[in-house]
């Protein structure tokens, strides 16, 4: 059970960010699945999902965007993928960090729960919906509540859902809940006119029988509704 506290949006100019960790890994999900990446995990989240198994609060430290860039450069010499995750990245003003990373030639992916708007009016200018592009910012949304903030929805290049076999709406094959968080009437769906990727991932219940049921439920939904089945490969290859 996740007991990490809910933290409100942090108003700042983005010159200082609360960071949990920076690490080199393989992106295990979403449109860049399988791509070597540096993850910047920011501290704190505006939600408290009971089923979340990610630590995003302990041992936090403050950093400037430039210091984070230096960490990235030490880990990935050639310009490549940087994933900003959390917690919830949009809880903080990440505009200066994203701008700096793009200026240095990196491609940036942001993983968000979709509840908070972008930190600045000009943030959208750095974003793209076409994941074939590089050296742009891409927003991937994994909804946890019943609504996605409209300002974020317009920037989302892909949606992803983690699904349990006993929490599926048969009408559209998507989850009723995400990580046990309350949602009314159920977790937010992509807009009706959304024609970009929607990924379904079986929830890891740490139980073989339940995991098999979760996988079969995802397969059924993908076959029926055309979603993309995706396994969390970072868990399969034992990377963070």
Where are these regions (language model features)?
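Short boundary motifs at domain starts and secondary-structure transition points
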Residues: 7-11, 30, 189-191
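Short secondary-structure boundary/capping segments within folded domains
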Residues: 28-32, 44, 220
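Short beta-turn/strand-loop junction motif enriched in small, turn-promoting residues
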Residues: 24-28, 145-146
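Conserved AdoMet/S-adenosylmethionine-binding subsite of the radical SAM
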Residues: 90-240
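Conserved Radical SAM active-site core
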Residues: 2-6, 12-24, 36-135
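Short glycine/proline-enriched turns and hinge-like loops at secondary-structure junctions
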Residues: 31-34, 153
């Amino acid at each position: 059970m996740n007991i990490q506290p809910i933290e409100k949006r942090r108003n700042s100019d983005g010159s200082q960010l609360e960071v949990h960790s920076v690490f080199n890994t393989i992106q295990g999900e979403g449109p860049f699945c399988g791509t070597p990446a540096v993850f910047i995990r920011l501290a704190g989240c505006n939600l408290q999902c009971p089923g979340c198994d990610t630590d995003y609060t302990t041992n936090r430290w403050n950093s400037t965007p430039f210091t984070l860039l230096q960490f990235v450069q030490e880990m990935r010499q050639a310009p490549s993928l940087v994933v900003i995750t959390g917690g919830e990245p949009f809880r903080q003003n990440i505009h200066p960090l994203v701008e700096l990373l793009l200026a240095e030639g990196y491609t940036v992916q942001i993983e968000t729960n979709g509840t908070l708007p972008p930190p600045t009016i000009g943030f959208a200018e750095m974003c793209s919906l076409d994941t074939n592009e590089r050296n742009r910012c891409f927003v991937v949304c994994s909804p946890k509540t019943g609504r996605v903030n409209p300002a974020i929805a317009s920037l989302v290049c892909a949606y992803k859902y983690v699904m349990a076999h006993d929490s599926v709406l048969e009408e559209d094959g998507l989850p009723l809940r995400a990580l046990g968080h309350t949602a009314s009437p159920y977790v937010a769906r992509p807009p009706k006119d959304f024609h970009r990727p929607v990924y379904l991932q079986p929830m890891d219940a740490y139980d073989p029988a339940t995991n098999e049921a979760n996988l079969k439920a995802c397969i059924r939904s993908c076959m029926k509704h055309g979603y993309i089945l995706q396994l969390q490969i970072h868990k399969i290859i034992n990377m963070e």
